[in-house]
């Protein structure tokens, strides 16, 4: 596998430098290179091209589990360990996150707190039974931009979202209104959120009541009570935001729109869905 790495990078660095870094000899590399290719080597080269295509199609976001699932969906039968080994050997890696934390929850307010109806039971038998709502932040050259989002727990689809340059309730309300207009939910829907003022204030509670939605709220300081929503925000930042430098709010809005509507909801393989897409799950449930 070390010789594979040397072969992949010899156009960029001298072979002797690469061999020294990997503690192998140049003569050993050239002897390896001059051998007739085995059937396995030819298969690996074809497979690597397919892996790189899947990885590129995901915008560099997929690691080996999702690459493997995507290959399986294309009727390419291969073991997950083989995919992982080829990706590691040839430097095909998923994007990684940069840790940073900004508090978007203000739970010091006089509004009533709804009970926690979920109790971390993150399962729903059909779409529009349980929604999750939360707010996160995006850095831009014009200051913070705040993304309010609503997720359907069954499909993991982002059914509503809104972006504002402030943390007032309008952003959360706009995301809820988009979700209601888009999904047209029936009775019995629960929406779970943190206990922030945006979700506990009178305007938001009135909007829930008008739509026939029951509110549910996390315990104080328990982000795991809304874990799937936290996971989506982590994914968004790992796969997109942490690899961008937005000069303006509009740049961030366009990029996030393309990610949510063009990639995440329609194309991204989701581990909690058995490596299927939110759109696929929604269509099956229709």
Where are these regions (language model features)?
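Charged DNA-binding/catalytic regions of mobile-element recombinases
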Residues: 1-286
């Amino acid at each position: 596998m070390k010789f594979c790495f040397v072969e992949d990078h010899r156009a960029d660095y001298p072979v002797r430098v690469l061999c020294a870094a990997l503690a192998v000899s140049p003569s050993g590399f050239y002897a390896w290179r001059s051998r007739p290719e085995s059937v396995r080597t030819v298969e690996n080269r074809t497979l690597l091209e397919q892996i790189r295509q899947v990885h590129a199609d995901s915008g560099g976001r997929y690691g080996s589990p999702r690459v493997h699932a995507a290959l399986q969906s294309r009727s390419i039968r291969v073991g997950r360990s083989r995919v992982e080994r080829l990706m590691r050997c040839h430097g095909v890696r998923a994007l990684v996150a940069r840790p940073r934390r900004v508090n978007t929850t203000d739970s010091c307010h006089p509004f009533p707190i709804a009970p926690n109806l979920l109790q971390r039971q993150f399962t729903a038998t059909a779409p529009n039974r349980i929604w999750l709502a939360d707010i996160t932040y995006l850095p831009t050259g014009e200051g913070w931009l705040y993304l309010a989002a609503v997720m359907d727990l069954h499909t993991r689809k982002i059914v509503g979202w809104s972006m504002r340059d402030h943390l007032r309730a309008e952003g959360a309300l706009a995301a809820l209104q988009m979700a209601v207009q888009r999904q047209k939910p029936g009775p019995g829907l629960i929406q779970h959120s943190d206990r922030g003022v945006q979700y506990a204030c009178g305007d938001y509670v009135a909007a829930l009541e008008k739509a026939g939605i029951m509110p549910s709220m996390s315990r104080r300081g328990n982000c795991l009570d809304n874990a799937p929503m936290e996971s989506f925000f982590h994914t968004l930042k790992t796969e997109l935001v942490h690899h961008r430098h937005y000069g303006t709010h509009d740049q961030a809005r366009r990029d996030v729109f393309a990610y949510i509507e063009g990639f995440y909801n329609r194309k991204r393989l989701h581990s909690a869905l058995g490596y299927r897409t939110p759109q696929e799950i929604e269509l099956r449930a229709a």
